[in-house]
C-alpha cells in the first residue's frame, strides 16, 4: 500500500466553520490523526526532514504539539520536552508570558530539560498568530538551547505567525498551508 500524498493528508483535515466562535474556520487535526495511514505519513515526512540534523531535543507545545513531537523525537533518537501550561510540570520550571486575544497566559518547561547549546526543534500542530511559538522559542533560548527550526503540520499564512518567527531569526517549516482564515 502506498503512503498518502501530502494532498491526501491535507484532505484528511476537516474544516469546521464557526468553531470555537463565529467567524473562525477551525482546522481539525483530530480527523488527521484518526486516519492511521495519514498520521503515519505525516510523522514520516517530518522524520525525513529532520533525521540527519543532529537534533538533541524536540520541544512540543501543549497539547497537540505532543501528538506530533513525541513520535518524531523517538524516530530521530532525540529527547522530547513538553511545553505546558502553569501547574502541569512537577519539577522547577522556567516560564514565558505571552499575549492572548483577551489577556495573558504563560508557558513552562522544566528548568533542566534543555542544556546549553543543545540543538532543538520546536514542533506544534498549527502556526496561526505565532504567539505560542514565540513564547516557546523564548523559553528554549532562555534555557540555552539553539532552535534550529520550528515545524508545523498546518500553517494559516493569513494570520502572519511567520513574522514572529522571522523576528526571532528562527526558520520554520510547515507541511500544509490553508490560505485565508
Curated annotation (Swiss-Prot):
GO molecular function, one term: adenine phosphoribosyltransferase activity
Main location: cytoplasm
Superkingdom field: Bacteria
Gene Ontology cellular component annotations, sorted alphabetically: cytosol
Catalytic activity: AMP + diphosphate = 5-phospho-alpha-D-ribose 1-diphosphate + adenine
Family matches, as Pfam families: Pribosyltran
Pathway per the UniProt entry: Purine metabolism; AMP biosynthesis via salvage pathway; AMP from adenine: step 1/1
InterPro entries found in the cross-reference section: Ade_phspho_trans (IPR005764), Adenine_PRTase (IPR050120), PRibTrfase_dom (IPR000836), PRTase-like (IPR029057)
Subcellular location(s) per record: Cytoplasm
Any single biological process term in GO: adenine salvage
Gene3D superfamilies in UniProt: 3.40.50.2020
Quaternary state and interactors: Homodimer.
Function text: Catalyzes a salvage reaction resulting in the formation of AMP, that is energically less costly than de novo synthesis.
UniProt record similarity statement: Belongs to the purine/pyrimidine phosphoribosyltransferase family.
NCBIfam families given in the database record: apt, PRK02304.1-1, PRK02304.1-3, PRK02304.1-5
Protein name, entry field: Adenine phosphoribosyltransferase
Amino acid at each position: 500500500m502506498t503512503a498518502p500524498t501530502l494532498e491526501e493528508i491535507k484532505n484528511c483535515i476537516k474544516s469546521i466553520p464557526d468553531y470555537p466562535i463565529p467567524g473562525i474556520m477551525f482546522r481539525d487535526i483530530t480527523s488527521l490523526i484518526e486516519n492511521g495511514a495519514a498520521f503515519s505519513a505525516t510523522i514520516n515526512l517530518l522524520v525525513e526532514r529532520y533525521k540527519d540534523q543532529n537534533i538533541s531535543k524536540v520541544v512540543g507545545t501543549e497539547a497537540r504539539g505532543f501528538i506530533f513531537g513525541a513520535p518524531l523525537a523517538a524516530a530521530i533518537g532525540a529527547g522530547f520536552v513538553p511545553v505546558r501550561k502553569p501547574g502541569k510540570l512537577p519539577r522547577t520550571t522556567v516560564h514565558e508570558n505571552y499575549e492572548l486575544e483577551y489577556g495573558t497566559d504563560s508557558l513552562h518547561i522544566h528548568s533542566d530539560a534543555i542544556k546549553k547549546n543543545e540543538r532543538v526543534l520546536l514542533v506544534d500542530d498549527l502556526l496561526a498568530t505565532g504567539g505560542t511559538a514565540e513564547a516557546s522559542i523564548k523559553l528554549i533560548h532562555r534555557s540555552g538551547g539553539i532552535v534550529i527550526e520550528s515545524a508545523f503540520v498546518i500553517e494559516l499564512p493569513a494570520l502572519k505567525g511567520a513574522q514572529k518567527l522571522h523576528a526571532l531569526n528562527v526558520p520554520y517549516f510547515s507541511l500544509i498551508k490553508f490560505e485565508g482564515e
